[in-house]
């Protein structure tokens, strides 16, 4: 693709490390220095920019970036008109979505969202919260929070809407969740103009395939072994696989090689059982990508 160059915005901050690990698994090497906002990547058709995820969707819509990875939450918060290439189910420390939650101090009299009528709410996602309140018919004062939102309750505001992945920060600050207003995964996005270009669309579709295949391989491993033919049927009955295990005859005609893909968590119990059933040369190996 001679001459193709796409400016891609990757999230700076809490999602940065997980995103770099995902790109590495997908086959890309992104070289960063401590203060670099334009890291190098081993793909001549890409130029990487590290940008706050809150801003990526807006910059893609306006054409300053061609594509990027940012949360569904920030696309909605910015009301950005962008093309979603695919959803990427990963986050900072888990494979679960982050949640925007309405929370109050554990001793607050507020038990349900309607109890916040006329109260003050602090959040970084002002538009999301206003849309939520409008939907449930509650009028409250919503103010923008520049950070450390959890510590503002109850002295400065009555409630907050903040992002959480595990809930540990909320518990540490003695907060209680009243409602969840949104769940969000990162989205791989581009502008409508970029998606309309066939060459760029092919490039982005290939990237999406590689990124999703890297996510598919999470927590899965390959397992291969040699099995006596007479034990094959019994072993296949207990052996998980994506579809069916691969079975190949060995040169002596008495043994077969068996290979399969399975959840890593199952190997601990399965490997000793396979050994007892006559399998030999059992090898577990890691995976970078699974393309369905």
Swiss-Prot record:
Cofactor: Mg(2+)
Keywords: Amino-acid biosynthesis, ATP-binding, Cytoplasm, Glycosyltransferase, Histidine biosynthesis, Magnesium, Metal-binding, Nucleotide-binding, Transferase
Name the UniProt record assigns to this protein: ATP phosphoribosyltransferase
Pathways per UniProt: Amino-acid biosynthesis; L-histidine biosynthesis; L-histidine from 5-phospho-alpha-D-ribose 1-diphosphate: step 1/9
GO biological process: L-histidine biosynthetic process
Family: Belongs to the ATP phosphoribosyltransferase family. Long subfamily.
Gene Ontology cellular-component terms listed: cytoplasm
Gene Ontology molecular function: any one: ATP phosphoribosyltransferase activity
EC number, UniProt record: 2.4.2.17
Name of one Pfam family that matches: HisG_C
InterPro entries, sorted: ATP-PRT_HisG_long, ATP_PRibTrfase_cat, ATP_PRibTrfase_HisG, HisG_C, N-reg_PII-like_a/b, N-reg_PII/ATP_PRibTrfase_C
Subcellular location: Cytoplasm
Catalytic activity, as annotated: 1-(5-phospho-beta-D-ribosyl)-ATP + diphosphate = 5-phospho-alpha-D-ribose 1-diphosphate + ATP
Function: Catalyzes the condensation of ATP and 5-phosphoribose 1-diphosphate to form N'-(5'-phosphoribosyl)-ATP (PR-ATP). Has a crucial role in the pathway because the rate of histidine biosynthesis seems to be controlled primarily by regulation of HisG enzymatic activity.
Superkingdom classification of source: Bacteria
SUPFAM superfamilies per record: GlnB-like, Periplasmic binding protein-like II
Regulation: Feedback inhibited by histidine.
Primary localisation category: cytoplasm
């Amino acid at each position: 693709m001679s001459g193709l160059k796409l400016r891609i915005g990757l999230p700076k901050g809490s999602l940065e490390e997980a995103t770099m690990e995902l790109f590495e698994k997908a086959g890309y090497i992104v070289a960063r220095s401590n203060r670099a906002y334009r890291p190098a990547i081993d793909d001549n058709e890409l130029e990487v920019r590290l940008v706050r995820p809150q801003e990526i969707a807006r910059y893609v819509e306006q054409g300053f970036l061609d594509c990027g990875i940012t949360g569904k939450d920030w696309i909605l918060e910015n009301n950005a008109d962008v093309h979603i290439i695919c959803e990427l189910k990963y986050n900072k420390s888990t494979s679960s979505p982050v949640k925007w939650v309405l929370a109050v101090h554990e001793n607050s009299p507020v038990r349900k969202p309607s109890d916040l009528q006329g109260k003050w709410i602090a959040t970084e996602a002002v538009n999301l919260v206003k849309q939520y309140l409008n939907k449930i018919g509650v009028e409250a004062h919503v103010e923008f929070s520049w950070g450390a939102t959890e510590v503002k309750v109850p002295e400065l505001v009555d409630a907050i809407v903040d992002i959480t992945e595990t809930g540990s920060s909320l518990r540490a600050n003695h907060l209680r969740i009243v409602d969840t207003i949104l769940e969000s995964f990162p989205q791989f996005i581009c502008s409508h103009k970029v998606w309309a270009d066939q060459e760029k669309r092919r490039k982005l579709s290939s990237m999406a395939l590689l990124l999703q295949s890297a996510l598919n391989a999470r927590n899965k491993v390959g397992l291969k072994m040699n099995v006596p033919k007479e034990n094959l049927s019994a072993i296949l009955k207990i052996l998980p696989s994506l579809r069916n295990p691969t079975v190949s005859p060995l040169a002596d005609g008495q043994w077969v090689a068996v290979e399969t893909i399975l959840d890593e968590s199952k190997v601990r119990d399965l490997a000793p059982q396979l050994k007892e059933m006559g399998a030999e040369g059992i090898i577990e190996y890691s995976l970078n990508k699974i393309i369905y």
